[in-house]
Design a protein with these regions (language model features):
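Compositionally biased, intrinsically disordered low-complexity regions
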Residues: 9, 28, 39-40, 250, ...
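Catalytic core of Fe(II)/2-oxoglutarate
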Residues: 215-281
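Non-heme Fe(II) oxygenase catalytic core, chiefly the N-lobe of the double-stranded beta-helix
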Residues: 14-229, 266
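Basic/polar N-terminal segments that are highly enriched at the extreme N-terminus
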Residues: 1-18, 280-281
Length: 281
């Protein structure tokens, strides 16, 4: 059984302050152009943004720990048998079986479909060596109502998709550091209870193979941010990015990479993998 983190690994509260990048709403729908990876990979969005300093709380100090249906994210201990995540294409079936065994008991549901693995680093050298993408340093959520439903239809055959869409489904990211602890450019998640719909805006997402949507977010003094200091490869952060249930539980946790001012100058770069999956009920 995979244990939820108790938040006691760090005895010291490592809350910090940093700037996060918020959307400045305009008259036109923003367009996000997904990068192809590599040394020059960077965010490309045709919209205006502002960098706002916020408090980023130490999630390990939360008692009780955060959970998917309240805050929209939760931390778990999870040891993977994958030795080299840069070879994930050759080990997908193995890792996806691990993820299924982890996530289904946590969320419930009848079927889980893993459909994407994205590797990221804040090091140009590492991005170039492995042709991977940049850390996503803008406040966002991966799906809108429309794009979540479209993704189901993209991945399942017509009859199965329409049958699954009649019931609840959830999209979750499983994020983990793949080398040493994630100290440089870690991930921070916003408590879903602190995010108002008036601050969330649909954005077109254009990639080489398809067009979809994601959500960008404008600033609010109500937002409550959390991160888990020094996440290692034996921990995973589950982040809810869509939930079709309309019963008061969290539907998503907006998130972003941020500059960690507590990180030593010589700390190793961030290297991470995020795996996206759908859970059907």
């Amino acid at each position: 059984m995979h244990q939820i983190s108790s938040g006691t690994r760090n005895m010291t509260d490592l809350s910090t302050y940093s700037k996060v990048r918020y959307l400045i709403p305009g008259n036109k729908k923003p367009v996000y152009f997904a990068s192809k990876g590599g040394a020059e990979a960077q965010l490309n969005i045709n919209a205006d943004f502002e960098d706002i300093e916020v408090k980023i709380n130490d999630g390990r100090c939360l008692n009780p720990p955060a959970n998917l249906d309240k805050e929209g994210f939760e931390l778990h201990n999870h040891k993977s048998m994958i030795a080299d995540f840069y070879e994930i294409k050759n080990q997908q079936a193995k890792y996806e079986a691990e993820l299924t065994n982890l996530v289904l008991p946590i969320i419930g549901g009848e079927k889980l479909v893993v459909f994407d693995h994205t590797l990221r680093s804040d090091s140009a050298e590492i991005r170039e060596a492995h042709k991977i993408r940049e850390a996503a340093a803008v406040v966002h959520n991966d799906y809108t109502f429309n794009s979540a439903h479209k993704r189901v239809r993209d991945l399942l055959d017509h009859d199965e998709a329409e049958a699954k869409l009649k019931n609840r489904f959830v999209i979750v990211n499983v994020w983990r550091a793949i080398t040493g602890p994630a100290i440089s450019s870690p991930l921070t998640c916003c408590d879903a209870q602190s995010v108002s719909e008036e601050n969330v805006f649909a954005s077109e997402r254009r990639a080489k193979d398809r067009i979809g949507e994601l959500e960008l977010v404008s600033r609010s003094v109500d937002h409550k941010w959390y991160y888990y200091p020094e996440m290692n490869r034996d921990e995973v952060l589950l982040i809810k990015t869509f939930d079709s249930a309309a019963d008061g539980r969290a539907t998503r946790s907006v998130h972003t990479a941020f500059r960690n001012h507590l990180a030593p100058i010589d700390c190793p770069p961030r290297e991470s993998i995020e795996s996206r999956m759908m859970v059907f009920f």
